Design a protein with these regions (language model features):
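Compact, glycine-rich, soluble single-domain proteins
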Residues: 1-108
Length: 108
């Protein structure tokens, strides 16, 4: 579950952590659809891509306090480099969550 502490809104979505090199490498590639959000931790390279993906995603870049510092929507086969360094990256299916830049999140 995700709690948007800024708006007090709760999103009933399962969080899958990509906290190892292999999980970060595979990410959402090859999936036909998802019903969860993927949280990337231990980030070394802030660039992301949507190669081998079959659907659009919303990507949220979070600082060390889980505050959204940047957001983008990507179609399959795209590459993106954020303008700010993030501590965490949250990926979800496009339009699944109503989260804006500046919102603070808590993962429950």
């Amino acid at each position: 579950m995700i709690l948007n502490k800024t708006t007090n809104e709760r999103f009933d979505v399962k969080i899958t952590k990509a906290d190892t090199f292999f999980k970060r490498l595979i990410g959402l590639m090859g999936r036909k659809d998802i019903d969860f959000a993927m949280l990337f931790t231990n980030i070394k390279n802030h660039s992301i891509h949507t190669h081998f993906m079959r659907f659009d995603i919303d990507v949220y870049f979070l600082d060390k306090n889980n505050k959204v510092i940047e957001k983008t929507t990507l179609k399959p086969w795209k590459f993106y480099r954020p303008s700010k360094k993030a501590e965490y990256i949250l990926e979800t299916k496009k339009d699944k969550l109503k989260i804006k830049i500046g919102d603070c999140l808590e993962f429950i």
